[in-house]
Amino acid sequence: MPMRIERDLHMAIGNGETSYTKNSRIQEKAMFQMKSVLEEATRAVCTTLLPQTMVVADLGCSSGPNTLRFVTEVTRIIAHHCKLEHNRRHDHLPQLQFFLNDLPGNDFNNLFQLIEQFNKSSTTHKGDAATEALQPPCYISGLPGSYYTRIFPSESVHLFHSLFCLQWRSQAPEQLKGTQKSCLDIYITKTMSPSMVKLFQQQFQKDFSLFLRLRYEELVSGGQMVLTFIGRKHEDVFTGESNHLYGLLAQSLKSLVDEGLVEKEKLESFYLPIYSPSVGEVEAIVKQLGLFNMNHVKVFEINWDPYDDSEGDDVHNSIESGENVAKCLRAVMEPLVASQFGERILDELFKEYARRVAKHLENEKTKHAVLVLSIEKAIIHV
C-alpha cells in the first residue's frame, strides 16, 4: 500500500515496548531545554494581552506524556505569573483552553485517556484552598487536522507551541516521484545530486512559509509561537546530523533488500518526508515574509541516545546506546516504514539498525541539533 502522509505519519500507537509513549525521552529532554523560552512567550501573552480566556494550541501533539507535560508547564507559568504580578484571586485568573492537534492517524484514544487522568489529578486538589487559588480553570480538547491547513478561526489563538514536528514535510517532493535514485537516498546524502537536494530544500521553504502564513491568520495581534524542531548546526546541507541518522536507516533497509526481505523497487521509490533546516534557512523565511518579529532563536544538542546524559565525546556502551536509538527511531518511523514495506520486516529492520548505530557510535558520538524559535505576530501597517 503506497505511503500517505495524512494516514501514515503518526507515532507508534499504544503503550507497548515499541510505542512512542515508552520511547519519547528525547522529546522530553528537548522540552526541558526550551522551558525558559516557553516561559518568556507565555508571560508575554499574559502581560501584553491580558486575555480572560487564553487559547493555547499544541501542534503535532502526538499521544505520549509530553503533551500533558506541556499543558502542566503552561498552567504553572500562568499561575505563577498571576500570583507575582497581580496577586489575583482564583475568580480573576484567566481561563485556559488547550487544543491538542495532530493528524487523524494520531493515537487520540490514548491521548484522551491521559487527559482523563490529568483531569482527575487536577480534581483531587479541589478543596485545597492554597492549591486551588493558584490553578487557572483549564479545558482540553483534541483537534485532528494538518497544521499545513487552516485549523482555527481568524485571530483566535494566543499561543502556539510545536515540539519536534516542523522537520516533517507535508509530502516528499512531488518531482522525486519516478526519479531514478540510489537505494540509499531516502534522505540527503553526500552522493545525492544537487538538483535532488534542492527539491528537499524547496519543499521545506514551501511548507514553512505556508505554516507561518496560516498561523499569522489564526493568531491574535501580539500572539506568540514557540517552535522546537530537529535542524542542523551548519549551513552546509550535506553535513547535517540527520543525514547520519537516516543514512544508517537506508543502509539497514538496503541490507534487507540484499537478503530478499524487501523489494528493491520499493526502496528505490521511498523517500522520507523530512528536512532538517539550518538557523539561517529558518531566519531567512521569517524575515522574507515579514509577518513575525523574532524574539529568540538558538540551537542546542541532545545525544542520539536519550539515556546518555553525559556531555563528553565517548559512548560508554555502544551496543546499549544503539538499541536505545533504534527504539526511539522506531517509535517515530514505524507507521511510515510499515506502510511502504509491511509490518513483518520491522523487528529485523530495527535490529539491524541498532547494530549499525552501535558501530557508528564506536567511532563518533553524534548528537541531534535542535532549533528553538520564538516569534511574535507583527503588526503590519497598510
Swiss-Prot record:
S-adenosyl-L-homocysteine binds at Y20, C61, N66, D102, L103, S146, Y147. InterPro entries: MeTrfase_7, MeTrfase_capping, SAM-dependent_MTases_sf. Its EC number is 2.1.1.277. Anthranilate binds at Q27, W168. GO terms for biological process: defense response; methylation. Mg(2+) binds at E268, F270. GO terms for molecular function: S-adenosylmethionine-dependent methyltransferase activity. It catalyses: anthranilate + S-adenosyl-L-methionine = O-methyl anthranilate + S-adenosyl-L-homocysteine. The keyword Cytoplasm does not apply. Keywords: Magnesium, Metal-binding, Methyltransferase, Plant defense, S-adenosyl-L-methionine, Transferase. It comes from the Eukaryota. The keyword Transferase applies. Because cv. Delprim is a hybrid line, AAMT1 and AAMT1I are likely alleles of one single locus. However, AAMT1I showed no enzymatic activity with all tested substrates. Belongs to the methyltransferase superfamily. Type-7 methyltransferase family. SABATH subfamily. Methyltransferase involved in the biosynthesis of methyl anthranilate in response to stresses. Utilizes anthranilic acid as substrate, but not salicylic acid. Produces exclusively the O-methyl ester. This is Anthranilate O-methyltransferase 1. The gene is AAMT1.
